[in-house]
Amino acid sequence: MNRERMAWRAGYLLAAFGIYMVDQASKAWAVRALRFGQMKTLVSGLLDLEYAENRGIAFGQLQEGGAFGRWFFVVLAAAAAISVLVYFFRTPRSDDRVLGACSLLLAGILGNLTDRARLGYVIDFILLHAGSYHWPTFNVADASICAGALLLAYDLFRSPRSQVPSPKSTT
């Protein structure tokens, strides 16, 4: 890969690294500052902090896997990170929205992968709610993954589709 092509991609990768570092730092803070099961209210009726250990996948699903489940999710996350990187390096320079989405996805995947490989679980601590509805506890990596996925979905529906020419009539 030539120097110019790598230089502009480095900015996106640097952004991903920055988000990854914010995720890891925020989780380290949560471990030190929050007690398991204790809730700290930041914005009454909207935002709380509550330490949780997620041994499953999104929203705490599939937590019964034990050691097999831990390493299965590590391998799955590693495969997802590799897939995002391949897609990232195949995306044209002009496609900023997709490149940004890949950066967000990569940061989030690697943030949760690091926890799972190192600890056997993912540290979650952000709890949003409105009235009686509570969103499942999440972290910066989860928010990054959701933002990246939404950006990709937006791009999918906003990108112009190539027009297939209609068959010519031969009558």
What are these regions (language model features)?
Residues 1-171:
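Alpha-helical transmembrane bundles and membrane-interface segments of multipass inner-membrane proteins
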